[in-house]
């Protein structure tokens, strides 16, 4: 890990605050599930299963966790219900480690990839454009030159919002008129970025799910056109999901992974919701790394996802 991987006190406080409702909800339910129990029996496991499912961890992932807890209880003779949080913590941490690549250092990109091209996808309303703006801020803060491409040409609000973010952060935004070909915008953005030796390019795309074939064709066209400028573009396809929607986020992930090759995910709006368990389930089911999490409206509230710190925050004071 590099120098920038240092997890500051401020970042920890933001993470703890952002996950507080999930922590309070989940552990309140777990406390009730094991109240008065002296051992991990079938009733405790059934109650825990219900808690995890209702916390938006997802059925498949929940059953996987329960099976692992049963095995550990048998193998290691953990029969005291008070040990349940320790076991649960271990197994969630293990799942996240299995399904995510190594934690990335703060907002860094491979030096050899220039420009590093990130195509950002997701349905309207999940915080996609805001995430792009916050990423641009963080990349610029890390000393990188950034270009934004307004390829969501079907919504005037999306283009306007990206322009506002560009002005706020101080990075150029490439746009065309409403209804323009999104691939053309992406082409222009990469051309400008290459001409100006930019480090990072973020391409906003339309978030329409009503036509899966249309979505697939549109994203494929954008990719193919970008390759004419940068042969290995996009270097990353980042899917933005709204964590507060719980199970709906699973469906969105399913639709977009069918439409294009998603390489990383950002889960937003985890503050103000008790549905933070969705991060665990989505990571497990789709085997795609969660790279960023959104923990508030502030420009600094988008964080690189760190597995250990995430689990520590959820279980802090409870293990």
Where do the language-model regions lie?
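Switch/coupling subdomain of P-loop NTPase systems
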Residues: 2, 9-15, 20
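Short hydrophobic/aromatic residue motifs in ordered secondary structure
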Residues: 59-61, 155, 271, 299
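Short glycine-rich anion-binding loops that position phosphate/pyrophosphate groups of nucleotides
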Residues: 206-208
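Short beta-alpha junctions and helix-cap segments that line functional grooves
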Residues: 3, 104-106, 135, 251-253, ...
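Conserved catalytic-core segment of NTP-binding enzymes
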Residues: 161, 181-196, 211-316
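Primarily NTPase-proximal linker/entry elements flanking Walker-type ATP/GTP-binding cores
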Residues: 16, 20-151, 158-178, 186-194, ...
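P-loop NTPase catalytic nucleotide-binding module
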Residues: 6-7, 313-319
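Intrinsically disordered, compositionally biased charged tails
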Residues: 5-8, 196
